Swiss-Prot record:
Biased composition (Low complexity): 80-111, 123-143, 154-174, 255-268
Domain called STI1: residue spans: 273-316
Phosphotyrosine PTM sites in chain numbering: 202
Phosphoserine PTM positions: 174, 199
NCBIfam families: rad23
Protein name: UV excision repair protein RAD23 homolog B
Family: Belongs to the RAD23 family.
Length: 408
């Protein structure tokens, strides 16, 4: 039989297999044809008619229609990108060169013309007085040749890796952000994803609820549809709607607070989950409110965290499921936290949960918010986008224009 397979990224391909074969045999065939890196057997989940196919069951038991398709979900292994070993190797190599040069005998010979001839095992021996072993004069003479060229050799060693470290650091940081946000869909791709998941046999309301609970992660949404949404987050949203505008400024302070809690991350990782320290951060509580109301702001938040604290973004990328679970937890009421002094700068108030929440803004910030509101967007969304984009008016305008407000 010819099985049509489709990924959540709209990639379609076909596999010819005997219907008497098991589901695991189909997974192995997918891995052999599409590559072990992209489709590992251990990370594959095959879904047909809203059910996950069991590895030990024969394909014919599921009565797969060749006109329909089987959904392939792939859980990618965590990519560990740590440039630290490279720097330690560099420091070790630098240490060995300095040690070898320091242990070299202080024999003043004429400098060798080519510094690249240092590793030559048979140098020109000018006065090799004690030739006890053929291996010992070679390091000594090599060290003598390294002596005059010590500075020129160390200079590229010191400069070249630093430039590559900076570029690799930037690329690894961008890779972390891409890894953390690659599974998120927004805008038109969101609507396409809703239609795609509905074709698996689910109602639109179910699909939208699952996507909202998974913060627009299609892989997680399908799991929620199959296994059930943990904690029934939809009912939480009805019973306890989070305040809208009380969480604008904390968007930027979340990453700042995370930067100050890097030491906490390392200490808690030994005793518990690496992300558990976020529960005690009031900034995370506020960030959870704004993300639960508007999940599409999550990519902007992750991008900001990636700039200010790449280590935290790496932890989030490696523990996405736990991070989303923490975001889905009900928001605790912050009693009397939103008050404060009302100094000369303006304030913006919005009703949320039966009480007023105030954000202190400068006159310039208030003017920027008013200009964004003049574009036709609701005040609550304008405030969220403005602070989520670090008070960058142009970025906030572009962000608002890309959103699909009909869904909200």
């Amino acid at each position: 039989m010819l099985v049509t397979l489709k990924t959540l990224q709209q990639q379609t391909f076909k596999i010819d297999i005997d219907p008497d074969e098991t589901v695991r045999a189909l997974k192995e065939k997918i891995e052999s044809e599409k590559g072990k890196d992209a489709f590992p057997v251990a990370g594959q989940k095959l879904i047909y008619a809203g059910k996950i196919l069991n590895d030990d069951t024969a394909l014919k038991e599921y009565k797969i229609d060749e006109k329909n398709f089987v959904v392939v979900m792939v859980t990618k292994p965590k990519a560990v990108t740590t440039p630290a070993p490279a720097t330690t190797q560099q420091s070790n190599s630098a240490a060995t060169t300095t040690v070898s040069s320091s242990t070299a005998p202080a024999v003043t010979q004429a400098p060798a013309p080519a510094p690249a001839s240092a590793p030559t095992p048979t140098p020109v021996s000018v006065t090799p007085a004690p030739t006890t072993a053929s291996s010992e004069p070679a390091p000594a003479s090599a060290a003598k040749q390294e002596k005059p060229a010590e500075r020129p050799v160390e200079t590229p060693v010191a400069t070249t890796p630093t430039s590559t470290d900076s570029t690799s650091g930037d690329s690894s940081r961008s890779n972390l952000f891409e890894d953390a946000t690659s599974a998120l869909v927004t805008g038109q791709s969101y609507e396409n994803m809703v239609t795609e998941i509905m074709s698996m046999g689910y109602e639109r309301e179910q699909v939208i609820a699952a996507l909202r609970a998974s913060f627009n992660n299609p892989d997680r949404a399908v799991e929620y549809l199959l296994m059930g949404i943990p904690g029934d987050r939809e009912s939480q949203a009805v019973v306890d709607p989070p305040p809208a505008a009380s969480t604008g400024a904390p968007q930027s302070s979340v990453a700042a607070a995370a930067a100050t809690t890097t030491a906490t991350t390392t200490t808690t990782s030994s005793g518990g989950h690496p992300l558990e320290f976020l529960r005690n951060q009031p900034q995370f509580q506020q960030m959870r409110q704004i993300i639960q109301q508007n999940p599409s702001l999550l990519p902007a938040l992750l991008q900001q965290i990636g700039r200010e604290n790449p280590q935290l973004l790496q932890q989030i990328s490696q523990h996405q499921e736990h991070f989303i679970q923490m975001l889905n937890e009900p928001v605790q009421e912050a009693g009397g936290q939103g008050g404060g002094g009302g100094g000369g700068s303006g304030g913006i108030a919005e009703a949320g949960g039966g009480h007023m929440n105030y954000i202190q803004v400068t006159p310039q910030e208030k003017e920027a918010i008013e200009r964004l509101k003049a574009l036709g967007f609701p005040e609550g969304l304008v405030i969220q986008a403005y602070f989520a984009c670090e008070k960058n008016e142009n970025l906030a305008a572009n962000f608002l224009l890309q959103q699909n407000f009909d869904e909200d």
